[in-house]
């Protein structure tokens, strides 16, 4: 499902749409993670593929890099040198889901370097605010699970560089 299709479903079924005036709680279901799987056909973010079907989690973390230096009469000072966004995605395998089929393709599972870097967007469906950038897709599990249990998958979406500020309300036209 695309970003535009997902937002249309949320509007019609739950009366949820991005609003600059939204104030209140957000839950995990209020965030969209989408990637561009075909740069020739998906030229706008609204056409990118959403990570959702049979996905149990897409947890974001910010991993800071630091250096420690000791100075005379000051002591140790920690300097933040960078931050990398990581989105940990996992769920039950669903063949035919465009997101899963792409991230679990042979090209991505065994790819390296620029072959596994894709544009991504991560934003709130309540406010439209989030981030956009490029990320490496690192598949950490393609078929997990115990006997008689659903097959599972896991992938880390690791930002390359610093993502840009994103606002669906002002940056995207369907």
Residue ranges and their predicted role:
Residues 2-90, 136-150:
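Solvent-exposed edge beta-strands and adjacent loop segments
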Residues 54, 93, 159-161:
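Secondary-structure transition/turn motif
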Residues 70-134, 164-174:
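Extracellular/virion structural assembly segments
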Residues 132-174:
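Mixed-charge, glycine-accented linear interaction segment located at domain edges/termini
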């Amino acid at each position: 499902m695309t970003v535009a299709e997902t937002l249309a479903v949320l509007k019609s079924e739950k009366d949820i749409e991005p609003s600059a005036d939204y104030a209140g709680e957000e839950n995990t279901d209020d965030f969209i993670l989408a990637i561009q799987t075909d740069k020739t056909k998906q030229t706008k973010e609204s056409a990118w593929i959403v990570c959702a079907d049979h996905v149990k989690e897409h947890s974001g973390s910010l991993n800071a890099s630091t250096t420690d230096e000791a100075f005379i009469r000051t002591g140790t000072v920690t300097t933040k040198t960078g931050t990398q966004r990581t989105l940990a995605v996992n769920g039950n395998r669903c063949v035919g889901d465009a997101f899963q089929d792409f991230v679990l393709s042979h090209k991505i599972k065994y790819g390296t370097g620029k072959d596994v870097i894709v544009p991504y967007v991560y934003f709130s469906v309540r406010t439209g605010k989030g981030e956009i950038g490029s990320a490496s897709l690192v598949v950490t599990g393609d078929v997990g699970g115990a006997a008689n249990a659903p097959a599972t998958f896991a992938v880390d979406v690791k930002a390359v560089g610093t993502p840009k500020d994103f606002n669906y309300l002002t940056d995207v036209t369907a």
